Regions:
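Active-site loop segments of alpha/beta catalytic cores
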Residues: 1-30, 35-40, 50, 54, ...
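Loop-to-helix transition at the N-terminal end of transmembrane alpha-helices
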Residues: 45-48
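Membrane helical hairpin/interfacial module
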Residues: 58-71
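Membrane-interface helix-loop-helix modules in multi-pass inner-membrane proteins
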Residues: 95-101
């Protein structure tokens, strides 16, 4: 059973030889492969090289296109700079005044360099891994993308002061995401991640008003193309987790800040699994083997065995390689303790 087969079987509720391991590796991957982060973000072959190397070196079951949240924002007009070996920096947001929303148009992925690059990354994965790994593309979720083009503080006040304009922007963002999903899946994606990171900052009422239906629409489109859907929201999503599950996403990431998920398990549908939730800093980066083991076992029990092994968010670049290798080894230990699904 290879990594692709293992991941798909586990998601579907079938047998697997061990628990799938899906760590989020971005800055860690670039550092491990000796690649400048600017190149990791901007050169598809370099990002793919780093991710494939990490998948081999750390027994990861997936490869993905994550590096930063700015591809769509740049296409909408947010101006960025790319430091030599650091995350991209915002120089000017696309929506400075609320009236700028009136000029927004649905993106055509082929017209924008970084959107084309993501499709190229998927094509490289498809050609170079030959169905071995679970390939995951990415789009920004509606609210996260709005924050990327507006500024997170302004975006949050806009929800109250300019709801009509925000709805218009979110509709355009959602249609743009749909347009971006299609070529990614056609290029060879098995899964599309929806990164709506900021949704943990809003109330359940605001999540339902501005985010839920749009995320569900993205999930439905992904499914219509025959791919799996994953939702990643940073922070404590306890208050909105029931709604997130109702989007129909196949994989729901659980941040370490989220309260125990036991009460939500009854809402997990057939073919839905969680992913998480070890703390990337206190557990993976700074912890020892016993702390890592305890964290993995705790969440796996909490999730009733319906969880992909991962951290709650990105593995830090300061994580010792030995800690990540031990973390990966827990996939076998978890499978030995629990029958898969």
């Amino acid at each position: 059973m290879n990594s692709f087969e293992r991941s798909v079987s586990f998601i579907r509720g079938g047998a697997a030889d061990r628990i799938p391991f899906h760590p989020i590796l971005m800055r860690f991957a670039a550092l491990h492969a000796g690649i400048r982060y600017r190149d990791f973000c901007l050169i598809p072959a370099r990002k793919c090289e780093a991710n494939i190397r990490c998948a081999v070196d750390f027994s990861s079951d997936w490869v993905n296109t994550m590096s930063d949240p700015w591809a769509e924002a740049e296409a909408f007009g947010t101006r960025l700079s790319y430091p030599d070996d650091d995350l991209p920096k915002v120089e000017r947001h696309a929506v400075v005044e609320i009236g700028d929303i009136s000029r927004m148009k649905v993106l055509v992925p082929g017209d924008h360099t970084r959107m084309r690059a993501r499709v190229e990354e998927i094509d490289i994965y498809r050609r170079e891994t030959a169905g071995k790994f679970f390939i995951c593309g990415w789009v920004e979720g509606p609210l996260a993308a709005y924050c990327d083009i507006r500024d997170i503080n302004m975006a949050m006040t806009d929800l109250y002061e300019y709801p009509v304009e925000v709805h218009r922007a979110l509709d355009i963002i959602t249609e743009s995401a749909i347009a971006f999903i299609t070529p990614q899946v056609k290029a060879g994606d098995h899964c599309i991640g929806i990164g709506d990171s900021v949704c943990s900052l809003v109330s359940p009422e605001l999540y339902r008003e501005f985010c839920f239906e749009r995320e569900r629409k993205l999930v439905e489109h992904i499914h219509s193309l025959g791919a799996y859907a994953k939702i990643h929201i940073c922070g404590n999503i306890s208050a909105i987790l029931p709604d997130v599950l109702m989007t129909g996403a196949d994989i729901i990431d659980i941040d370490h800040r989220t309260e125990p998920v036991t009460g939500a398990l009854k809402l997990l549908g057939t073919g839905q699994v969680l992913s998480g939730k070890s703390d990337p800093v206190s557990v993976l980066q700074d912890g020892d083997k016993e702390l890592i083991r305890s964290s993995c076992l705790s969440f796996f029990r909490e999730a009733g065995g319906r969880a992909i092994l991962s951290a709650g968010c990105e593995v830090t670049p300061g994580t010792p390689a030995g800690n990540l290798k031990f973390f990966a080894s827990m996939a076998g230990e978890l499978a030995a303790e629990y029958s898969t699904h």
